[in-house]
Amino acid sequence: MDTLCYTLLLLTTPSWVLSQVTLKESGPVLVKPTETLTLTCTVSGFSLSNARMGVSWIRQPPGKALEWLAHIFSNDEKSYSTSLKSRLTISKDTSKSQVVLTMTNMDPVDTATYYCARI
């Protein structure tokens, strides 16, 4: 009886509940001062074209709090940190399930761990 109930539960559960959402950051470990940093976030388990989904980039300098950098919405609308707006560009390639962040004119104060997050 328990097996039957579990099977029925699986059959009636929407597929999005069973899917696993993952976001994986990739990019260089080090960049030199004045260079441009390009980071890629490859997502799975959801679509970048979904009207309720967006992806943000955030960073955390050593020993400091998280800092939000940029966000891209499903309709391609973009939002940037006011203090870094002139150095940041966020874009997405829905066909590759990727969100790319570029940050120009890197400086030692930009040393941090960079993360992407679904919001």
From Swiss-Prot:
Places the protein is found: Secreted; Cell membrane
Framework-2: region residues: 55-71
Region (Complementarity-determining-2): 72-78
Ranges for domain Ig-like: 20-119
GO biological process: immunoglobulin mediated immune response
Pfam families linked: V-set (PF07686)
Region (Framework-3) residue spans: 79-116
Location of region: Framework-1: 20-44
Keyword Cell membrane: yes
GO function terms (MF aspect): antigen binding
Leader sequence segment: 1-19
Region (Complementarity-determining-1): 45-54
SS bond list: 41-116
A GO cellular-component term linked to this record: immunoglobulin complex
Keyword Oxidoreductase on entry: no
Residue span of region Complementarity-determining-3: 117-119
Residue list for modification Pyrrolidone carboxylic acid: 20
Function: V region of the variable domain of immunoglobulin heavy chains that participates in the antigen recognition. Immunoglobulins, also known as antibodies, are membrane-bound or secreted glycoproteins produced by B lymphocytes. In the recognition phase of humoral immunity, the membrane-bound immunoglobulins serve as receptors which, upon binding of a specific antigen, trigger the clonal expansion and differentiation of B lymphocytes into immunoglobulins-secreting plasma cells.
PANTHER family: IMMUNOGLOBULIN HEAVY CHAIN
Record-given protein name: Immunoglobulin heavy variable 2-26
Protein species of origin: Homo sapiens
Lineage of origin: Eukaryota, Metazoa, Chordata, Craniata, Vertebrata
